[in-house]
From Swiss-Prot:
Metabolic or biological pathway: Protein modification; protein glycosylation; Cell surface structure biogenesis; S-layer biogenesis
E.C. number: 2.7.7.-
Identification of the protein by name: Low-salt glycan biosynthesis nucleotidyltransferase Agl11
Cofactor note: Binds 1 Mg(2+) ion per subunit.
Provenance organism: Haloferax volcanii (strain ATCC 29605 / DSM 3757 / JCM 8879 / NBRC 14742 / NCIMB 2012 / VKM B-1768 / DS2) (Halobacterium volcanii)
Major enzyme class: transferase
Domain of life: Archaea
GO biological process: protein glycosylation; S-layer organization
A GO molecular-function descriptor: nucleotidyltransferase activity
Gene coding for it: agl11
Cofactor: Mg(2+)
Length: 357
């Protein structure tokens, strides 16, 4: 079995962060979202991975993943070009996949339990496809699956007004090569895209059994700033955190802290976990780093009160103010203005931006 990892798309809902880079490289707990997907595929025994590239961020993604050897996998890069839908992206991998079954994994998704169970469920029978599902509170906003008592899919409906179930498709699929014939027969939807749900429905109509696996753990599509922050919370809550860096004697550190080897917490700083602090980061005197915060590499925080936030890296924050629920892009420089107000600020700041609060 092979893996097909989608890393295209414009990331419009994550602007301004994605004006300067692909959404799949935004870090969660100081690791790019795309790396979690590669690790999930490797955990499922998949070592041949095709990475679908769009127009944006090709070089950055290739620089991160390389040939895959750092992850114990072999990576082939496949250029999709214009984003014409998930089914179009899957179709671009036809030559790479050949006669093998494959997992298709949306590279901006992250889930607790990985894809091992999804793969094992698919391999337990004779299926044309397998889909990961999760119960949601707002099924009208998702593609929805109707399943029988054996877990076989009987119908797929895209964003129904009256959904028959609350089982939503969540961006992880397993396919046999038969899906490529289904894709070739598709017509663009009203969105002008080739829809993967239409391809799966075509397999159903052609007599293929479609497996389903209901995901019990958490899952996040990290398409918006608030989704990145929630994913950061979930990962920090579950992650095994290690302190390897330097903590000064007069610093206060409570709770679960991940402190990289070359990171420093100086005298007079307060850090309360769960928190992740990357290599080269410095938490200076008078700084409070509160729960569910990730401080990226080579960042310096001084005097600020920050919590439930992601600092992507190479940033300088020197302000006496309070920053909460914020996503701060690489190279952000935030300082104080004379009229700073005491209440917390919620910010989404793009790469290399400068602010005076």
């Amino acid at each position: 079995m092979k893996g097909v990892l989608l890393s295209g798309g414009t990331g419009s809902r994550l602007r301004p962060i994605t004006h300067t880079g692909p959404k799949q490289l935004v870090p969660v707990a100081n690791k790019p979202v795309l790396e979690y997907a590669v690790e999930d595929l490797k955990e499922a025994g998949i070592t041949e991975i095709g990475v679908i590239l769009g127009h944006k961020g090709r070089e950055e993604i290739q620089n991160l993943l390389g040939d895959g050897s750092d992850y114990g996998v072999e990576i082939t890069y496949i250029v999709q070009g214009n984003p014409l839908g998930l089914a179009h992206a899957a179709g671009c991998a036809k030559d790479f996949v050949g006669d093998d079954d494959f997992v298709m994994y949306l590279g901006d998704n992250i889930l607790k339990e990985g894809v091992v169970d999804l793969v094992e469920s698919f391999e337990s029978g004779d299926f044309g496809a397998g889909i990961a599902l999760q119960e949601v509170e707002n099924p009208q906003q998702f593609g929805i699956a109707d399943v029988d008592d054996q877990g076989n899919v009987t119908q797929l409906i895209e964003k129904p007004d009256e959904p028959p179930t609350n089982l939503a498709l969540i961006g992880m699929y397993v396919f046999s090569p038969a899906v490529f014939d289904a894709i070739e027969q598709l017509e663009p939807s009203w969105r002008g895209e080739l829809e993967i749900t239409d391809a799966i429905q075509s397999l159903l109509e052609d007599g293929y059994a479609i497996d389903s696996h209901v995901v019990e753990g958490w899952w996040k599509d990290t398409g918006k700033p608030e989704d990145i922050l929630e994913a950061n919370q979930l990962v920090l809550e579950d992650k095994s955190l290690k302190k390897r860096g330097t903590v000064s004697d007069d610093a206060t550190v409570d709770g679960r802290i991940e402190l990289a080897e070359s990171a420093t917490i100086e005298d007079g700083a307060v850090v309360r976990g769960p928190v992740s602090i990357a290599d080269g980061a410095v938490i200076k005197s008078g700084t409070y780093v509160g729960p569910y915060t990730s401080v990226g590499p080579n960042s310096t925080l001084e005097g600020v009160h920050i919590e439930n936030s992601v600092v992507i890296g190479e940033s300088s924050i020197n302000t006496s103010g309070r920053i909460v629920d914020s996503l701060l892009g690489k190279g952000a420089n935030i300082g104080s203005a004379d009229d700073f107000l005491p209440e917390g600020r919620r910010l989404v700041v793009g790469e290399n931006s400068q602010l005076k609060l």
